[in-house]
């Protein structure tokens, strides 16, 4: 009887992909990046093994927010002090720190455990077009083909 072949972390070949976020919706970009980080686009995907690839996201400042999300949707965090609830609109977050906005969105789509944290560390987001990963020879990935 044949058993299903399971991936081992030592046998996995990791690629580097670069994704241009210009005029791409935040949710669609995050879903595609999370899929690649988890390794769900590979035939040897195993849920308990980190078999995903490295992803570089450039031009995060040119991401598109649809509808009225820029003014009506908020990112909340609390300082654990009374009255310490902070709210920042997505429009402000896009203007001040677009890298954090993409990271928050992708992190919410990954598992909330140690494996999810390992997968999250393989994502590199840059607000502009310049990045420091030219030595890895990243393969350009068209986001519209993934969606």
Curated annotation (Swiss-Prot):
InterPro entries linked: Ribosomal_uL13 (IPR005822), Ribosomal_uL13_bac-type (IPR005823), Ribosomal_uL13_CS (IPR023563), Ribosomal_uL13_sf (IPR036899)
GO molecular function terms listed in the Swiss-Prot or TrEMBL record: mRNA binding; structural constituent of ribosome
Gene3D superfamilies, per the entry: Ribosomal protein L13 (3.90.1180.10)
GO CC, one annotated term: cytosolic large ribosomal subunit
Keywords: Ribonucleoprotein, Ribosomal protein
Annotated GO biological process: negative regulation of translation; translation
Top-level division of the source organism's lineage: Bacteria
Assembly and binders: Part of the 50S ribosomal subunit.
Family: Belongs to the universal ribosomal protein uL13 family.
Function field: This protein is one of the early assembly proteins of the 50S ribosomal subunit, although it is not seen to bind rRNA by itself. It is important during the early stages of 50S assembly.
Protein's UniProt name: Large ribosomal subunit protein uL13
Native source organism of the sequence: Lactobacillus acidophilus (strain ATCC 700396 / NCK56 / N2 / NCFM)
Gene that this sequence comes from: rplM
